[in-house]
Amino acid sequence: MGNGINAGRKLLENRKKFRWSDRDYKRRVLQLKRKSDPLEGAPQAKGIAIEKVGIEAKQPNSAIRKCVKVQLIKNGRQITAFAVGDGAINYIDEHDEVTVEGIGGRMGRSKGDIPGVRYKVVAVNGISLKELVKGRKEKTVR
């Protein structure tokens, strides 16, 4: 590769060519996150709670993290979402409409000791799960 006075075009072409070996560049330009993401790039999504599941925490912790299997309304994909808060799982019943968002792990991945769970429940039937757990609001009977 030349560094001469007329080498500008070649340097630019090489930069463009070798940028494709950068994983982050490739994912960004081809929009691979949006294509593979169950939420399709949106910050939140609504879904129907299918079943409650207990997921065992990773070592060295020992607990059963209460999660919910959710089928998204927009595309029918199934995801597992964590029910945040003490006793929060009791406010979620099967066939409830839940709102989910990313759990906030590194690079859009899972967080802490919950393996394979990338989402958390934010609201149940349009009411904030945090408010339900604190007892400020009551769940509507539909």
UniProtKB/Swiss-Prot annotation:
Biological process according to GO: translation
Per the record, its GO cellular-component terms are: small ribosomal subunit
Instruction: Indicate the secretion signal residues.
Output: none
Quote the SUPFAM superfamilies the UniProt record gives.
Answer: Nucleic acid-binding proteins
Function description: With S4 and S5 plays an important role in translational accuracy. Located at the interface of the 30S and 50S subunits.
Record-linked PANTHER family: 30S RIBOSOMAL PROTEIN S12 FAMILY MEMBER
**Family the UniProt entry places it in:** Belongs to the universal ribosomal protein uS12 family.
Q: What is this protein called?
A: Small ribosomal subunit protein uS12
Provide the species name. Answer: Thermoplasma acidophilum (strain ATCC 25905 / DSM 1728 / JCM 9062 / NBRC 15155 / AMRC-C165)
